[in-house]
Amino acid sequence: MPIIKTAGIISKPNSTAAEEIVPKLIEWLRRRGIAVRIDEQTSLYSGGVSGMPREEVPQSCDLVVVLGGDGTLLSAARAIGRREIPLFPVNLGGLGFLTAISIEELYPELERALRGEHRIAKRKLMTTEVIRENNVIASFDALNDAVLTKSSIARMIDLDTYVDEQFVCAYKADGLIIATPTGSTAYSLSAGGPIIFPSVPAICLTPICPHMLTNRPVLVPETSVIRVASRGPDESVYLTIDGQVGTPIREHDTVVCHSSHHSLLLIRPPRMMFFDVLRQKLKWGER
């Protein structure tokens, strides 16, 4: 990682922990000659430092510190977009599966990161496009997943699904989760999907409550192009990206998902390994 000249800070809203940390963190960085850019939420905790829209924070940054939970990290990832700037995620939330650095570890681990004594985990992004009448009307990059669900009342939806032009099936279910390896430990896991090691080049199709005993989750290569078309009435289906943004899907729209050429860079302490986090955060393998 290059020398850190400018660092960004993105924070969780309404967080007493962030309110306590932010002024000290800004001062800590400035004492080391590092310029600081903060979002408008963080400015509320800063004691007078002006903020900017979250999407502008990563501009000119060499590193972005994220103070919050996994939801804050997903929001920060969306703000960073395709810039591939390292994120230093500090857990102020609950589970904190991705934001696995604790408050107590903040300054020691940040000091190590500034010295280059850290590990960068690359998490592949997934591009999702909505095609309507042969035009791309919406495009998103997902870290975790793209989820197609019924938009309102409790009813099943019909989703014609293809992988590389090969017909998979017509899912009749509450929805369909298209998950990256990173997203395999999120919504997909709750819906019965497998845990995928982060470096495995795959995409997982996990139906939500399918009305068919044989509709099990399916892994496909990350080189695959997945196409899903709704057969329901207009706007009976909703597409959600990483649980935070989305758009209604009309009948005959096609949702196309494929692996992006870009990755999210997560700073990890050298000792922090995937299965350690599984055991600590998800109690995986406990008896």
From Swiss-Prot:
Q: Which reaction does it catalyse?
A: NAD(+) + ATP = ADP + NADP(+) + H(+)
Q: What is its EC number?
A: 2.7.1.23
One of the entry's Gene Ontology molecular-function terms is: NAD+ kinase activity
UniProt-annotated catalytic positions: D70
Q: Which UniProt keywords apply?
A: ATP-binding, Cytoplasm, Kinase, NAD, NADP, Nucleotide-binding, Transferase
**SUPFAM superfamilies in the record, alphabetically?**
NAD kinase/diacylglycerol kinase-like (SSF111331)
Question: What does UniProt give as GO cellular component?
Answer: cytoplasm
Which sites bind NAD(+)? D70, G71, N144, D145, R155, K172, D174, T185, A186, Y187, S188, L189, S190, Q244
From the UniProt record, give one GO term of the biological process aspect: NAD metabolic process
Kindly list the cofactors needed: a divalent metal cation
Q: List the disulfide bonds.
A: none
The subcellular localization recorded is: Cytoplasm
Check the record and name the InterPro entries matching this protein: ATP-NAD_kinase_N (IPR017438), ATP-NAD_kinase_PpnK-typ_C (IPR017437), NAD/diacylglycerol_kinase_sf (IPR016064), NADK (IPR002504)
Question: Pfam families given for it?
Answer: NAD_kinase, NAD_kinase_C
Give the protein's function: Involved in the regulation of the intracellular balance of NAD and NADP, and is a key enzyme in the biosynthesis of NADP. Catalyzes specifically the phosphorylation on 2'-hydroxyl of the adenosine moiety of NAD to yield NADP.
Do you know which PANTHER family this protein is assigned to?
A: NAD KINASE (PTHR20275:SF0)
For this chain, the family text in UniProt reads: Belongs to the NAD kinase family.
User: What is the protein named?
Assistant: NAD kinase
